[in-house]
Amino acid sequence: MAIFHQLPDSVLQLLAVFLSIIIEALPFVLLGSILSGFIEVFVTPEKVQDFLPKNKVLAILFGTLVGFIFPSCECGIVPIITRFLEKKVPSYTAIPFMATAPIINPVVLFATYTAFGNSWYYVLLRFVGAFLIAMILGILLGFVVDDQILKDNRKASHVHDYSGLSAGKRVFQALVHAVDEFFDTGRYLIFGSLVAASMQTYLPTRILTTIGHNSVTAILIMMLLAFILSLCSEADAFIGASLLSSFGVAPTVAFLISGPMVDIKNLIMMKHQFKTRFVGLFVGTASLVTIIYCLLLGVI
C-alpha cells in the first residue's frame, strides 16, 4: 500500500473517480447484459412482430413511452437495444426507447422529484424534453434516413432455435449469452470511465462555471459537464439540483436531459455497435433538440 502514498494527489483523485464511476455503472451493465441474454433466448422475431404496432407513428410512440414500464439505466441500454435490433425490432422503435428509458422510468423520475425538493416541475420538464428528442429520432429513422444502424462488420450473435430446450437449459443459455455480453460491453465501459475520470480530474468544473455567463453558453457548458461526469441517470438529478443556483433552470434541465443520452461511456459503447453515421445523427439530434428546448424554457 506504500506505493499509493508516493502517487501524486491528482492520480489518486483520478483513481477514486474512476472506481466510483465503475462501481456506480457496473450493476446496471450487468443487469442490461442479463436482460439481453434472456431476450436472445426467450424472444423470437415472430413474437416481436406480433407485439409491435403496425403503424409507424404508433410504433415510434410505443418505443418512446415503453421505458416507463420497462426501465433501464443508460449504462446497460446499448446491449439491450442491440439485441432488440437483432430480433428485428425496427430502429424507429428501438432508438426512441434507448433515448427515453434511462429518463422516464419511475425510479429516475422519483429521484428527480426528490432531488429538487419534491417538485414535479423539473420532473415534467425532463420528461417532455426526453419525449421530444425520442419522437424526433423515431421520425427521422422511420421516414427520412436509413434505418439500418447496426455495424455491418460487427460481431453479431448467431441465430439459434432454443424452443426445443427445457426451461432450465434455456435459462442456462441466457446466462451464457449474458456473460459474453457483459465482458464485451464491460471493456468499453472501463475505457469510457477512465476517460471520464481523467477529464473530471484535469478539467476543473470551476473553469466551466466561470465561462457559462449567457444562456446559450450556460446550456452548452452543462451539456458538456453531463458528458464529462457520465453519471447514471438514477444519480444525476442530485448533482443537477446542486448546480441549479449557479446556472439556472434551463441549463440544469439540459444537464438532466443530455447526460443519460450522451455521455462518454455510453458514446463509446454505441460506437462499438452502431454505424458512425447513426451515432452522429443520434448525438447531433439529441444535442440540437436539447439546446432549442432549453432556450425556449429560458424565454418562457
Could you describe each region identified by the protein language model?
Residues 24, 28-31, 40, 44-45, ...:
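Short helix-loop boundary/capping segments at the starts of domains
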Residues 1-34, 46, 50, 124-223, ...:
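Selected transmembrane alpha-helices and immediately adjacent juxtamembrane segments
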Residues 24-25, 63-68, 228:
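Interfacial helix-start motif at the membrane-water boundary
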Residues 69-128, 204-274, 278:
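Membrane-interfacial helix-loop connectors
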Residues 38-43, 202, 264-265:
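Structural signal for the C-terminal ends of transmembrane alpha-helices
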Residues 35-66, 207-213, 239-240:
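Membrane-embedded helical hairpins/re-entrant loop segments and their flanking transmembrane helices
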